[in-house]
Amino acid sequence: MELPEVGDEARSFGPFQNGESAYFSSVNRGKKSITIDLRTHRGGDIVRQLLKDCDVIVENFRPGSMDRFGLGYDQLSHSHPHLVYASISGFGQTGPYANRPGLDQIAQGMGGHMSVTGPPGSGPWRSGTAISDLSA
């Protein structure tokens, strides 16, 4: 599922082949994409409609976001007892960093990867490839 109006950020990553991001195409091969605004009632209704044909939800928002959208496990499991619901986030569901965003460059920095990339003496450099995202 992609963000309304802007889509997946990876669609803008070069290089491009036939007008499409080579990176986006490679990591999303064989997938179908939809756009739903979860912040709206209509978006929630669409997700609930899709659940009629789904067994699994995997979401990677910060903890509590899906509850605010009315789509948390407790809100959906009563009407969909078969549902497997996986919540993943950069820093887990609990703990002091739980509500922080989990982006690739943050994982690279906190994991120490940025300290060993780039020219000597330059300070931390982000890897050109989303290495934390791809290795997760």
What are these regions (language model features)?
Residues M1-S135:
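N-terminal helix-loop segment corresponding to the beta1-alpha1 unit
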